[in-house]
């Protein structure tokens, strides 16, 4: 695997020098300062690329070129935004950047309720609490019809939880859900959030798939033409939330994508922490079935709690993800490629580390502090080395 590291640009508290010292050789970044839908110019791409290369690193993966909400709802200037997206892909290819991670999650990107969940050892993790999320949706957002998405017991628990919340607790929960987490390009006030949700009132899973298919049929031929590999990121969490459909959550969704646009440019990001939240997702089987189309991996683990829809981010080698078997399957795919004459390593980044040690005293991007990811990268690197030596050394 090619070891990479997500970097949020010049304002990231983790520097490129830190990244290099961590042992990564590739950088995963994006032009977050460019508004959604606008073209990434060659000049802007080259500026960022030069910064990365001056630090002795390579810009390996774009994460992400965000998709404008008009494209997802098939309204407004969606065709203009698609044309702009096509041009951005051409410009990236002209600059020698050929792997693009993106997602098709409506309204929200990845979602958590607690950004400072304290673990028994004193480090902090990200957490999604199903009951707190229900409390937000039922009693703060007050989304019409939300009760249908919860069990009677969850509704009762959410009511009790909400009754114990201070005003600051309510404000913090609201911020965590709607204000935008690292990598998300959208942040909302509560009223704006309600308005955006309303734009999806007539969009179910089938309709969102229709809009996604329209996007893929416009984008993938351009990607194919210029040599860009599109790697869709799964929904996080991988299930419908807030009455919104989710369409990249299961192996069936992956198969639908391949059947919709059967091009090798139409590929996947294997995010084990997203897909792995669902007990019915067999990560190793996903890798084995779609290995040739896996162009990027996010390796992390989560741990489902008593309510299986509640989870927190576990240490990279613990939790519900069998990281050994996952890494072994990825390495096997790389060796399959090698046997066919390709030296195409799969970029991997350690995802969402715990906030720990002196990072606890620093202002960090949630999930993206340095030391927790350094630990995760070192652990995964060790697993890969052991697998390479045990199964593939001559």
From Swiss-Prot:
InterPro entries, alphabetized: Man_deHydtase, Xyl_isomerase-like_sf
Sample GO molecular function, one term: ferrous iron binding
Gene3D superfamilies linked: Divalent-metal-dependent TIM barrel enzymes
Keywords assigned by UniProt, alphabetized: Iron, Lyase, Manganese
Cofactor: Fe(2+); Mn(2+)
Coiled coil residues, start to end: none
Catalytic reaction equation(s): D-mannonate = 2-dehydro-3-deoxy-D-gluconate + H2O
Biological-process GO terms, alphabetical: D-glucuronate catabolic process
Enzyme Commission (EC) number: 4.2.1.8
Pathway: Carbohydrate metabolism; pentose and glucuronate interconversion
Domain of life: Bacteria
Keyword Cytoplasm: no
Protein's UniProt keywords contain Chaperone: no
Free-text function comment from the UniProt entry: Catalyzes the dehydration of D-mannonate.
PANTHER family: MANNONATE DEHYDRATASE
Assigned protein family: Belongs to the mannonate dehydratase family.
Stated name of the protein: Mannonate dehydratase
Organism: Salmonella newport (strain SL254)
């Amino acid at each position: 695997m090619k070891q990479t590291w997500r970097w949020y640009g010049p304002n990231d508290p983790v520097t490129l020098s830190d990244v290099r010292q961590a042992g990564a050789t590739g950088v995963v970044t994006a032009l977050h300062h460019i508004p959604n839908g606008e073209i990434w110019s060659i000049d802007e791409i080259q500026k960022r690329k030069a910064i990365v290369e001056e630090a002795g690193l390579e810009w390996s993966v774009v994460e992400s070129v965000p998709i404008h909400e008009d494209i997802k709802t098939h309204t407004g200037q969606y065709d203009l935004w698609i044309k702009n997206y096509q041009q951005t892909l051409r410009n990236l290819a002209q600059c020698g950047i050929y792997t693009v991670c993106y997602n098709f999650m409506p309204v929200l990107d990845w979602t958590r309720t607690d950004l400072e969940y304290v673990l028994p050892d004193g480090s902090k993790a990200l957490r999604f609490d199903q009951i707190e999320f229900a409390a937000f949706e039922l009693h703060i957002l007050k989304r019409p019809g939300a009760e249908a998405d919860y069990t009677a017991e969850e509704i009762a628990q959410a009511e009790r939880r909400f009754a114990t919340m201070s005003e600051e607790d309510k404000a913090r929960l609201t911020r965590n859900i709607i204000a935008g987490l690292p990598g998300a390009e959208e942040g909302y006030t509560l009223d704006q959030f309600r308005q955006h949700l309303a734009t999806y009132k007539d969009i179910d899973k089938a309709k969102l798939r229709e809009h996604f298919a329209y996007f893929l049929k416009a984008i993938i031929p351009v990607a194919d033409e210029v040599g860009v590999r599109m790697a869709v990121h799964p929904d996080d969490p991988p299930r419908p939330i807030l009455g919104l459909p989710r369409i990249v959550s299961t192996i069936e969704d992956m198969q639908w994508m391949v059947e919709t646009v059967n091009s090798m440019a139409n590929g996947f990001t294997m995010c084990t922490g997203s897909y792995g939240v669902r007990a019915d997702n067999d990560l190793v089987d996903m890798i084995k079935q779609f290995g040739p189309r896996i162009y990027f991996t996010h390796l992390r683990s989560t741990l489902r709690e008593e309510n299986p829809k509640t989870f927190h981010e576990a240490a990279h080698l613990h939790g519900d993800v069998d990281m050994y078997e996952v890494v072994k399957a990825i390495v096997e795919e790389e060796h399959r490629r090698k046997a066919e004459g390709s030296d195409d390593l799969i970029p991997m980044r350690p995802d969402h580390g715990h906030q720990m040690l002196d990072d606890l005293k620093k202002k960090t991007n949630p999930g993206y502090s340095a030391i927790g990811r350094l630990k995760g990268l070192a652990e995964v690197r060790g697993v890969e080395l052991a697998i390479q030596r045990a199964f593939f050394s001559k």
